[in-house]
């Protein structure tokens, strides 16, 4: 082996490997919209909204609930419920194996988390879809957890808020999943009859049986900026009607312009704005919102290998 190989090349490779390993996993994140490389702790301060282009990144169900509800007094509803493969469904993979994989990936039993708590001191119940669990698809457990949350709102006469992020009904549960559309719609009709507010927040994306049922039944329907909202996807529609769709079709801004939703609210403003809205709808005093102090973060230089 030549002296050049021993003295120059091998130490250079070793230094490169040391540099790579010194960057902790997940410390940097690339924005899918503007491709800016963002420091993860700084991104968490902005609630996963890109500080460069305002792109609202997808976040999990528990993260949504955590940034929305007050820290104290939370109780999860329907946590004991688990999905069952009653139909022994199999496509390219057994449904029960898909469930196990999704549960391992997300740490959740199914694609909806429901929790009671307070928003700026006001009692409220919240449901949030976990899109990483089989695309946030709605099956029997998702439907039952939503109904339990709505029943809690009925029993305690408190408002309900739902954050939707779903591809629609879960095909592996066939008619059982389609039945959840009627089941969730029926319980929301009871809320309306009792005069209990239901606010639906549409996040990216909301499609299929969820958009055709509970997601579009809010007394007030709110969209996050640039969220994709529809029944079938744009490509499916274009192939069916054989026409080019308008620019931005199915984005929340397009839906707001055409009267399909009521508001678009930045994720960082959801707590105070929905708090004020719920206070008006329930006749309660306007709550005081005190923003948490923002601690300065020293952002290190972006590593060359990121």
Curated annotation (Swiss-Prot):
<dbReference type="GO" id="GO:0008270">
    <property type="term" value="F:zinc ion binding"/>
</dbReference>
<keyword id="KW-0808">Transferase</keyword>
<feature type="binding site">
    <location>
        <position position="31"/>
    </location>
    <ligand>
        <name>Zn(2+)</name>
    </ligand>
</feature>
<keyword id="KW-0275">Fatty acid biosynthesis</keyword>
<keyword id="KW-0479">Metal-binding</keyword>
<keyword id="KW-0444">Lipid biosynthesis</keyword>
<dbReference type="InterPro" id="IPR011762">
    <property type="entry name" value="COA_CT_N"/>
</dbReference>
<keyword id="KW-0862">Zinc</keyword>
<dbReference type="GO" id="GO:2001295">
    <property type="term" value="P:malonyl-CoA biosynthetic process"/>
</dbReference>
<comment type="subunit">
    <text>Acetyl-CoA carboxylase is a heterohexamer composed of biotin carboxyl carrier protein (AccB), biotin carboxylase (AccC) and two subunits each of ACCase subunit alpha (AccA) and ACCase subunit beta (AccD).</text>
</comment>
<keyword id="KW-0547">Nucleotide-binding</keyword>
<dbReference type="InterPro" id="IPR034733">
    <property type="entry name" value="AcCoA_carboxyl_beta"/>
</dbReference>
<dbReference type="Pfam" id="PF17848">
    <property type="entry name" value="Zn_ribbon_ACC"/>
</dbReference>
<keyword id="KW-0443">Lipid metabolism</keyword>
<feature type="binding site">
    <location>
        <position position="53"/>
    </location>
    <ligand>
        <name>Zn(2+)</name>
    </ligand>
</feature>
<comment type="pathway">
    <text>Lipid metabolism; malonyl-CoA biosynthesis; malonyl-CoA from acetyl-CoA: step 1/1.</text>
</comment>
<keyword id="KW-0963">Cytoplasm</keyword>
<dbReference type="GO" id="GO:0005524">
    <property type="term" value="F:ATP binding"/>
</dbReference>
<comment type="function">
    <text>Component of the acetyl coenzyme A carboxylase (ACC) complex. Biotin carboxylase (BC) catalyzes the carboxylation of biotin on its carrier protein (BCCP) and then the CO(2) group is transferred by the transcarboxylase to acetyl-CoA to form malonyl-CoA.</text>
</comment>
<dbReference type="GO" id="GO:0003989">
    <property type="term" value="F:acetyl-CoA carboxylase activity"/>
</dbReference>
<dbReference type="Pfam" id="PF01039">
    <property type="entry name" value="Carboxyl_trans"/>
</dbReference>
<dbReference type="InterPro" id="IPR041010">
    <property type="entry name" value="Znf-ACC"/>
</dbReference>
<feature type="zinc finger region" description="C4-type">
    <location>
        <begin position="31"/>
        <end position="53"/>
    </location>
</feature>
<keyword id="KW-0276">Fatty acid metabolism</keyword>
<dbReference type="GO" id="GO:0009329">
    <property type="term" value="C:acetate CoA-transferase complex"/>
</dbReference>
<comment type="similarity">
    <text>Belongs to the AccD/PCCB family.</text>
</comment>
<feature type="binding site">
    <location>
        <position position="50"/>
    </location>
    <ligand>
        <name>Zn(2+)</name>
    </ligand>
</feature>
<dbReference type="InterPro" id="IPR029045">
    <property type="entry name" value="ClpP/crotonase-like_dom_sf"/>
</dbReference>
<protein>
    <recommendedName>
        <fullName>Acetyl-coenzyme A carboxylase carboxyl transferase subunit beta</fullName>
        <ecNumber>2.1.3.15</ecNumber>
    </recommendedName>
</protein>
<keyword id="KW-0863">Zinc-finger</keyword>
<feature type="binding site">
    <location>
        <position position="34"/>
    </location>
    <ligand>
        <name>Zn(2+)</name>
    </ligand>
</feature>
<feature type="domain" description="CoA carboxyltransferase N-terminal">
    <location>
        <begin position="27"/>
        <end position="296"/>
    </location>
</feature>
<keyword id="KW-0067">ATP-binding</keyword>
<dbReference type="GO" id="GO:0006633">
    <property type="term" value="P:fatty acid biosynthetic process"/>
</dbReference>
<dbReference type="InterPro" id="IPR000438">
    <property type="entry name" value="Acetyl_CoA_COase_Trfase_b_su"/>
</dbReference>
<dbReference type="GO" id="GO:0016743">
    <property type="term" value="F:carboxyl- or carbamoyltransferase activity"/>
</dbReference>
């Amino acid at each position: 082996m030549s002296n050049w190989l021993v003295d120059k090349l091998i130490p250079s490779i070793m230094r490169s490997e040391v540099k790579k390993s010194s960057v902790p996993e997940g410390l940097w994140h690339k924005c899918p919209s503007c491709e800016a490389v963002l420091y993860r702790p700084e991104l968490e301060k902005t609630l996963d909204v890109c500080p460069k282009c305002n792109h609202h990144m997808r976040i999990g169900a528990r993260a949504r609930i955590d940034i929305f509800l007050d820290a104290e007094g939370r109780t999860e509803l329907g946590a004991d419920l688990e999905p069952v493969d009653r139909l022994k469904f199999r496509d390219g993979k057994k449904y029960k194996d898909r469930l196990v994989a999704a549960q391992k990936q997300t740490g959740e039993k199914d694609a909806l988390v429901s929790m009671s708590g307070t928003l700026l001191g006001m009692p409220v119940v919240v449901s949030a879809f976990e899109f990483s669990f089989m695309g946030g698809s709605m099956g029997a457990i998702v439907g039952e957890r939503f109904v339990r949350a709505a029943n809690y709102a009925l029993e305690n006469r408190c408002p309900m808020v739902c954050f939707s992020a779903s591809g629609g009904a879960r095909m592996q549960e066939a008619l059982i999943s389609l039945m959840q559309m009627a089941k969730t719609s029926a319980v929301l009709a009871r809320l309306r009859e009792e005069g209990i507010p239901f606010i639906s927040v549409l996040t990216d994306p909301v499609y299929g049986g969820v958009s055709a049922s509970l997601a579009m039944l809010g007394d007030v329907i709110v969209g996050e900026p640039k969220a994709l909202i529809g029944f079938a996807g744009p490509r499916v529609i274009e192939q069916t009607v054989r026409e080019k769709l308008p620019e931005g079709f199915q984005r929340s801004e397009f839906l707001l312009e055409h009267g399909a939703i009521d508001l678009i609210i930045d994720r960082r403003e959801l707590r105070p704005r929905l708090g004020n809205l719920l206070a008006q709808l329930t006749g309660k005093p306007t709550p005081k919102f005190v923003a948490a102090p923002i601690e300065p973060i020293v952002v290190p230089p972006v590593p060359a290998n990121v």
